[in-house]
């Protein structure tokens, strides 16, 4: 009987999701300046824009690149580099360019040819997460279903993978006992990589160390303060020796690599009432960070007083798995997860007065809800070169590159502005 009920619930949910998606699609011309939807051959659990841009002469677009991965059923997995053509500001943009058949608009007839897979490198198992090294973006670290962290220099691999499926990383980083997701390169110390694991530990490697036989590098330090699965780890963006970690023990920990005690963080705080899945340091404000949790909230923290949670962002209907500050705006951050929504928040609007109708849609700091995904969002990335452009990937193979309409984040023009809550959500 329970099976029947579950099947009925699933069918109802699917219908609701489809209805919401239809509403979203109908409203996209008013809500977005850009929407590109691309179905990948396999779902990607990871997404990160590379920092370089090519601007071909005489064209109305620029070429950006993304690091992606695959999560196949039983076939060969790959680390993937894709290119994306984004229209320049002077490209033709208006709602009349909307193509309802293809579900995209904005100076583009179709996405075909605008998003291309450039490089595929054989990978052992699915790519849980892939992140490039800031000092040399050709170097990419990946988290695998095994305990190894792999490092690839993609310039040393053919763009078409060896059909044998052999995975040939340039380094294998050892130290974990289990798989995981968290991965962070030190922006201030070249080659220093942190990784979080289901084995309750955080490993630190220096990839400039001389590898042992088989291109293996052992962890330089293993941090053992958490008592459960460590979900995410992130270096501080200014202080080369500080990093943060979050775990299923509901804690946020701040560590200092200069300390000799690798089992005790410099700060530990009970951050949420459920597992903490992600964290992000603010790129403009050295004391501010955010954490996202299975308790459906994003929490805002100040390193100078971690006893006090600055704010709790509430609107998600389910677990949050990714949170990222905007690289261009100090007060903007985004979060995503199981509820198929990517929410963009604006700290500067916290506490603003709202009409009762607006309050029904969410708190004043909820700037935008991206409702284009019909499955759990696995990862997303803010484009470092084009403000307000985000790439998000979901479990149903869909990758979307999108930018909310300018009148939503530019308050200057109250005339003709669109209510940002028209999303199907």
Curated annotation (Swiss-Prot):
Changing residue 179 to A: Loss of interaction with ZNF827 and loss of localization to telomeres. GO terms for cellular component: ATPase complex; CAF-1 complex; chromatin; chromosome, telomeric region; cytosol; ESC/E(Z) complex; histone deacetylase complex; nucleoplasm. GO terms for biological process: brain development; chromatin remodeling; DNA repair; DNA replication; DNA replication-dependent chromatin assembly; negative regulation of cell migration; negative regulation of cell population proliferation; negative regulation of DNA-templated transcription. WD repeats lie at residues 32-125, 126-175, 176-223, 225-270, 271-314, 315-371, 372-404. Expressed in neuroblastoma cells. There is a cross-link at residue 4 (Glycyl lysine isopeptide (Lys-Gly) (interchain with G-Cter in ubiquitin)). The modification N6-acetyllysine is found at residues 4, 160. The modification N-acetylalanine is found at residue 2. Keywords: Acetylation, Cell cycle, Chaperone, Chromatin regulator, Chromosome, DNA damage, DNA repair, DNA replication, Isopeptide bond, Nucleus, Phosphoprotein, Repeat, Repressor, Telomere, Transcription, Transcription regulation, Ubl conjugation, WD repeat. Changing residue 128 to A: Loss of interaction with ZNF827 and loss of localization to telomeres. Changing residue 73 to A: Loss of interaction with ZNF827 and loss of localization to telomeres. The modification Phosphoserine is found at residues 110, 355. Pfam families: CAF1C_H4-bd, WD40. The keyword DNA damage applies. It comes from the Eukaryota. Changing residue 126 to A: Loss of interaction with ZNF827 and loss of localization to telomeres. There is a cross-link at residues 4, 160 (Glycyl lysine isopeptide (Lys-Gly) (interchain with G-Cter in SUMO2)). Core histone-binding subunit that may target chromatin assembly factors, chromatin remodeling factors and histone deacetylases to their histone substrates in a manner that is regulated by nucleosomal DNA. Component of the chromatin assembly factor 1 (CAF-1) complex, which is required for chromatin assembly following DNA replication and DNA repair. Component of the core histone deacetylase (HDAC) complex, which promotes histone deacetylation and consequent transcriptional repression. Belongs to the WD repeat RBAP46/RBAP48/MSI1 family. This is Histone-binding protein RBBP4.
